[in-house]
C-alpha cells in the first residue's frame, strides 16, 4: 500500500507541475496579445530606412574628375567610367558613367572612397523591374534624386514660399523675389 501512496503523490505533483507550465505559457500568450503588430503592409506603408541605409547610388556628373577610384575599390569592378584625356589642359574629361544595379552588392565602398564626394547613397530601395537591362543606370538616371527627397515637406514649403516675378518697369535682367 505504501508504494501505491507514493505513486499517487508523484502523480499529483506532476499534475500540479504540468498545470503550472500550462498557466505560465498561457500568461505569456496573453502578454503578447495586447502588443501592436510589427508587420508592415508593404505596398501601402513604406518602411522607414535607417540613417546610414545603403540604397541606390546618386551620382553628380559635374563633381566627378574621372579618377576611377570607385572602380578600383569596388569588389566586382562594377562602375563603368568612360573618359578622354584633354591634351590641351592635360586633364581627364568624363564622357560616360554607369552602374548596373542588377550586379551591384550595395557595399558602399565607391561612396566612401570617392575623393570629390560625387557619389552618395540614397534611401531608395524600390528597384524592382521586369527587364534586368533597365537596372543599368547611366549618369542621367544616377543623377535623379529619389521621390522621397523631391516630395519632402521642407523643400515644398521653400518652393512655395518664394515666387519669381519679372516686373516690366525694370530691365529684363532684374528679377524680384517676393514672399506671399
From Swiss-Prot:
Listed under GO biological process in this entry are: photosynthesis, light reaction
Q: How is the cofactor bound?
A: Binds 2 [4Fe-4S] clusters per subunit.
Fetch the Pfam families from UniProt. Fer4
State the reactions this protein catalyses.
Answer: a plastoquinone + NADH + (n+1) H(+)(in) = a plastoquinol + NAD(+) + n H(+)(out); a plastoquinone + NADPH + (n+1) H(+)(in) = a plastoquinol + NADP(+) + n H(+)(out)
Q: Which InterPro entries match?
A: 4Fe4S_Fe-S-bd, 4Fe4S_Fe_S_CS, NADH_quinone_OxRdtase_chainI, NDHI
Q: Which UniProt keywords apply?
A: 4Fe-4S, Chloroplast, Iron, Iron-sulfur, Membrane, Metal-binding, NAD, NADP, Plastid, Plastoquinone, Quinone, Repeat, Thylakoid, Translocase
The GO terms describing molecular function are: 4 iron, 4 sulfur cluster binding; iron ion binding; NADH dehydrogenase (ubiquinone) activity; quinone binding
Q: Where is the 4Fe-4S ferredoxin-type domain?
A: 55-84, 95-124
Where is this protein chiefly located? plastid
Q: How does it sit in the membrane?
A: Peripheral membrane protein
Annotated [4Fe-4S] cluster 2 binding sites: 74, 104, 107, 110
- What do the Gene Ontology cellular component annotations say? chloroplast thylakoid membrane
List of residues binding [4Fe-4S] cluster 1 = 64, 67, 70, 114
Enzyme Commission number(s) from the entry: 7.1.1.-
What job does the chain carry out?
NDH shuttles electrons from NAD(P)H:plastoquinone, via FMN and iron-sulfur (Fe-S) centers, to quinones in the photosynthetic chain and possibly in a chloroplast respiratory chain. The immediate electron acceptor for the enzyme in this species is believed to be plastoquinone. Couples the redox reaction to proton translocation, and thus conserves the redox energy in a proton gradient.
Q: What is said about its interaction partners and assembly? A: NDH is composed of at least 16 different subunits, 5 of which are encoded in the nucleus.
Give the family from UniProt: Belongs to the complex I 23 kDa subunit family.
Q: What is this protein called?
A: NAD(P)H-quinone oxidoreductase subunit I, chloroplastic
Q: Which organism does this record belong to?
A: Drimys granadensis
Amino acid at each position: 500500500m505504501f508504494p501505491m501512496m507514493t505513486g499517487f503523490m508523484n502523480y499529483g505533483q506532476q499534475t500540479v507541475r504540468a498545470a503550472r507550465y500550462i498557466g505560465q505559457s498561457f500568461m505569456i500568450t496573453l502578454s503578447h496579445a495586447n502588443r501592436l503588430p510589427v508587420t508592415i503592409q508593404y505596398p501601402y506603408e513604406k518602411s522607414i530606412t535607417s540613417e546610414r541605409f545603403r540604397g541606390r547610388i546618386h551620382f553628380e556628373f559635374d563633381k566627378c574628375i574621372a579618377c576611377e577610384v570607385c572602380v578600383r575599390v569596388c569588389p566586382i569592378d562594377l562602375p563603368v567610367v568612360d573618359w578622354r584625356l584633354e591634351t590641351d589642359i592635360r586633364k581627364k574629361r568624363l564622357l560616360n558613367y554607369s552602374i548596373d544595379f542588377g550586379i551591384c552588392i550595395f557595399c558602399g565602398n565607391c561612396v566612401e572612397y570617392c575623393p570629390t564626394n560625387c557619389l552618395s547613397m540614397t534611401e531608395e530601395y524600390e528597384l524592382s523591374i521586369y527587364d534586368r537591362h533597365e537596372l543599368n543606370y547611366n549618369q542621367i538616371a544616377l543623377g535623379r534624386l529619389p521621390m522621397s527627397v523631391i516630395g519632402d515637406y521642407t523643400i515644398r514649403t521653400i518652393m512655395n514660399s518664394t515666387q519669381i516675378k519679372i516686373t516690366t518697369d525694370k530691365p529684363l535682367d532684374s528679377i524680384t523675389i517676393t514672399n506671399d
